[in-house]
Regions:
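N-terminal alpha-helical interaction modules that lie
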Residues: 1-73, 89, 167-172
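Structural signature of alpha-solenoid helical repeat junctions
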Residues: 41, 75, 112, 152-156
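Alpha-helical adaptor scaffolds
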Residues: 47-56, 67-115, 119, 129
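Inward-facing hydrophobic residues that define packing positions of alpha-helical scaffold repeats
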Residues: 59, 66-67, 100, 137, ...
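Alpha-helical junction/boundary sensor with strong preference for TPR arrays
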Residues: 73, 107-108, 144-147, 168
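Sensory/regulatory domains in signal-transduction proteins
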Residues: 116-119, 136, 153
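TPR/TPR-like (Sel1-like) alpha-helical repeat modules
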Residues: 130-148, 155, 159-162
Length: 172
């Protein structure tokens, strides 16, 4: 595993101890191997190992784990989001966006909509569609604030929105 040292305490949480969202790339990154190993050892959630494989860039391994997990829990939104993330990690950005749009149609008006919009924004950003990323992150932030979401989620959306706006401004 690759570990980033120092200066990551301000990075948004990625949902698994030892992994945080890099505020430049807006992608999850391992920041502490020991904390991550402890979290994985204590976890019974198959999604945690899938997330790790995605962070490591092992899309094929993540897809295999995901197929098994989806068989056991076909309706899990988190696992369906990971399906699109497998596509993103495989550099199939258009297809990842398409899957996220389908999930967005299903989650519109629910508490999960903000999470889907946040992930959609990351796929847009990774694929170079920064304008669409700004829109998606802004909507995710608005929904999270309006819904009194956890402060860590609001922070993650704010960081992503600011980064996307900065990149958009640099390229204008």
């Amino acid at each position: 595993m690759i570990m980033v040292k120092g200066g990551t305490t301000e990075w948004p949480d990625a949902g698994l101890p030892g992994i945080r969202i890099n505020p430049q790339s807006l992608m999850p990154q391992i920041v502490n191997d020991e904390v991550l190993a402890e979290a994985l050892a204590a976890s019974t959630d198959p999604g945690d190992l899938i997330l790790l494989r995605l962070v490591e860039g092992h899309a094929a391994e993540a897809a295999e784990l995901l197929a098994d997990a989806r068989y056991k829990d076909p309706d899990s939104l988190r696992l369906r989001i990971f399906e699109a993330d497998v596509l993103r990690v495989s550099n199939r950005f258009d297809r990842a966006v398409e899957v996220f749009r389908q999930l967005l149609a299903e989650t519109q008006g629910t508490l999960e909509e903000a999470a889907v919009r946040q992930h959609l924004g990351r796929s847009y950003f990774a694929g170079g569609n920064v304008g669409a990323a700004v829109e998606s992150f802004a909507k995710a932030l608005d929904l999270r604030v309006a819904g009194s979401a956890d402060a860590a989620l609001i922070y993650a959306s704010a960081v992503a929105l600011q980064r996307a706006r900065d990149v958009l401004e640099q390229h204008s």
